[in-house]
Amino acid sequence: MAKLTKEEADKLLELISQMGSYGSAESEPDAGFLRRYLPLPEHARALDSQVILVIGDRGAGKTELFRAIQFPAGLQQIRKLAKGGGVPDPSHSAWLVGYSTSGTEYPPELVFREFSKGKQPTDLQLIWLGLLLRCLHRVRSIADLPEAMLDALSPESPLPVLFNRVQQHLESCFASLNRLDGELDRSSKWIFVTYDELDRVSAGDWDQLKTILRGLVQFWSSNCRRWRRLRPKIFLRRDLFNRVALFGPDVSKIAAQRVELVWTPRNLYALSAKRLVNHDLLLRQYFESVMPGGEERGELGWYPTAATEEDYRKLIERMCGKYMGAEPQKGQSFTWIANHLQDGNGQVLPRSIVRFFEGAAEIERQNRKAEWPRLLHHTSMRAAVDQVSVSRVQEIEDEEFPWMKTVRNTLQATHPQVPIERRDLEYLLVIDWSRASEKPPETSGHGLLQLLMELGIFYLRGDGRVDARDLYLKGFGLKRRGGVARPY
């Protein structure tokens, strides 16, 4: 390839800065979605008819997975990765949404929370049964239900009305679903009902969230063997699943057949390579001499088949250089990226690594330091980690844990240095929650720190002190002992 001019280098950086994170899968445009999407064997397992629970953090690719199956080419590629033939034929399958915060078809958080007050999980089983019927009724007629029950299946019908009608016509509701499952079985068809964003049904009230989720899990735990062709897919955040004791034996019945969406470094670099190479012809030309093994797959574009993490080293080093400075002691760029984007549990989200490359490219565009053929200077990469940190913490507050803003404000008031003695951090986390509208499930300093460690924000070192990964330093206003001074 001819040597790039400065203008072409600037164009390459501009393209990398727009490589396709768009903040979240929900906001990505349809055009070119499959060219950015990387189907994985784990995704195929999640579509297996026997898998009920899909565990993954926000940003781990759950939404992308179910967006991909809306495209025939996407579903077909995912099915090719399946082992054992557990993924049903897409032409004989319907995928419905059992709960989502999008649109007006499902109860808003405040309504759900208010309804669940004073209720037991057994009560919530009835409301989830009603919502299942409502979901099915939108796309097909539900046979032999009383007129009063059908009226309650309208999205405009209040939850208390739906609850009361299900109570009154419980046998008819189950009989109708039994008949539907029989019809599906005779015609060799499937209906999958998906439940996502469940943490938002009562994001600000942990007690109500427990009750609501227990109702859903108990309902499907009791009925997943009753219906062979009417199948649920329940997406749970990892921290909710890890608190499995809160759900008792109900989860254990369905947890044996579960899929966990975990991204290995190989898969993260494969995703990055696919997005970069398929984004623009100029980027493909830039990486042409160092591209890992791959093949063209129709609407998916170029698909990386190189099996090991090491296979992607040359591609990353062409863009980022070999070292994070002038000397090897500064660390190798290839391993530095994943190490500095991981949380306290050792996990890296695909959303984070895409934002990292976008951010580093934008920073480099504003102040070019890298020498050709390198595009990203190590200072731009370090600054990009801070950007990812801020956006990740903001995302946690906005989409996952509204109470995390209080934790952030508390830490930013003192900028504690890590590593820190556990008792000292527990003392800092003694917060008066009495006036807070949204509270964490654990409010003592000890309990809150334990929760933050479960979430990967902090982790326990071998010497007993508490530390935080770089992913959360800037976002929470933390400082690292012996590290570069931060201008807080």
Regions found by a protein language model. Name each.
Residues A2-K11, R226, D311-Y488:
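C-terminal leucine-rich, beta-strand-based interaction scaffolds used for sensing/assembly
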Residues A68-F71, D123-R138, A270-V277, R355-E362, ...:
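Short, hydrophobic/amphipathic alpha-helical patches that form generic packing surfaces
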Residues L198-K330:
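The catalytic "switch" region of P-loop NTPases
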Residues K6-A9, Q50-V51, G56-F192, V201-D207, ...:
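P-loop NTPase nucleotide-binding core
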